Swiss-Prot record:
PANTHER family: 3-HYDROXY-3-METHYLGLUTARYL COENZYME A SYNTHASE, HYDROXYMETHYLGLUTARYL-COA SYNTHASE. It comes from Methanosarcina barkeri (strain Fusaro / DSM 804). One of its GO terms (biological process) is farnesyl diphosphate biosynthetic process, mevalonate pathway. Belongs to the thiolase-like superfamily. Archaeal HMG-CoA synthase family. It catalyses: acetoacetyl-CoA + acetyl-CoA + H2O = (3S)-3-hydroxy-3-methylglutaryl-CoA + CoA + H(+). It is an enzyme of class 2 (transferase). This is Hydroxymethylglutaryl-CoA synthase. (3S)-3-hydroxy-3-methylglutaryl-CoA binds at residues 29-30, 113, 154, 204, 237, 246, 269, 299. Pathway: Metabolic intermediate biosynthesis; (R)-mevalonate biosynthesis; (R)-mevalonate from acetyl-CoA: step 2/3. Interacts with acetoacetyl-CoA thiolase that catalyzes the precedent step in the pathway and with a DUF35 protein. The acetoacetyl-CoA thiolase/HMG-CoA synthase complex channels the intermediate via a fused CoA-binding site, which allows for efficient coupling of the endergonic thiolase reaction with the exergonic HMGCS reaction. Catalyzes the condensation of acetyl-CoA with acetoacetyl-CoA to form 3-hydroxy-3-methylglutaryl-CoA (HMG-CoA). Functions in the mevalonate (MVA) pathway leading to isopentenyl diphosphate (IPP), a key precursor for the biosynthesis of isoprenoid compounds that are building blocks of archaeal membrane lipids. Pfam families: ACP_syn_III_C.
Amino acid sequence: MTIGIVSYGAYVPRYRIKVEEIARVWGDDANALKSGLMVYEKSVPDIDEDAATIAVEAARYAMTRSGVDPERIGAVYTGSESHPYAVKPTSTIVSQAIGATPNMTAADFEFACKAGTAAVQACMGLVSSGMIDLGMAIGADVSQGAPGDALEYTAAAGGVACLIGKKESELAAIIEDTYSFTTDTPDFWRREGMPYPEHGGRFTGEPGYFKHVTNGAKGLLNKLGTKPEDYDYAVFHQPNGKFPTKAAKTLGFTKAQIAPGLVVPKIGNTYSGSCLMGIAATLDQAKPGDRIFATAFGSGAGSDAFSITVTDRIEEIRNRAPTVSELIKDPIYIDYARYAKHKGKIRRS
């Protein structure tokens, strides 16, 4: 049975803060940070934006592109590590907003930055089993980093929604297969009630990101019998610009393959939206027949790899909603004081 992406939608807040502005406040070397992270600015949510509003915007764009009846959607799953409520599903808010309720199921997912791709896999399973016609999988975050922490230079806001289905005439991209690699690795964590996450800093790269991304990617390549050169594009989770570039090189992918989907330098790490944002940016310019290799990563830790082939329908739906490049254009730059207010780092007494 053929399973794939019927439609997709992305959303990125317009507000941005430059690395130089954050470095100015904390007395850090902005040039060294930009060179090391390969990130130059990041997206900042407005005061009234959170993971739920971002998920709704992305889902609405996906529905605009698809042209399908929302009542056909049998499941909405939202992955995030910044759900606005500890007890109250983000996914029910999204479901109601897009007109999918009430004859459907909804749930929230958590797995650090790969909660969105875990939701994609869950929708794939439900669609392929025949339990539902269409499933909406979303990755959205308004990620946090403690003041002065290294994460503050990259923790950003954004989200992507993917409508998953099986009717071949509706598919904009076919998901050929998926593969996951998971271990118990405490590289990044936040307990209930803690405002900011903790992490192992520079010691998390090899045992966390690189171990799981490379093993997940190799697992899918071996499963399919494919090689990096069989793909036109590649997308890897983007906590910064350096990590996906290094992972691609290690696996045998080229800079040209990852360039179209490498959006982190301009918007930062959108966490659960990160890999999906790269896929969306790639779909925005891919041609029918092009193949995309993608691997998401989530701390804790695990990876989800996907092999995707673009269909003719991409040309029909692509321009029905804003592309990622259009969403990134015309940013509104803010200073650290306004950024701190938007992010809730300072509050009225």
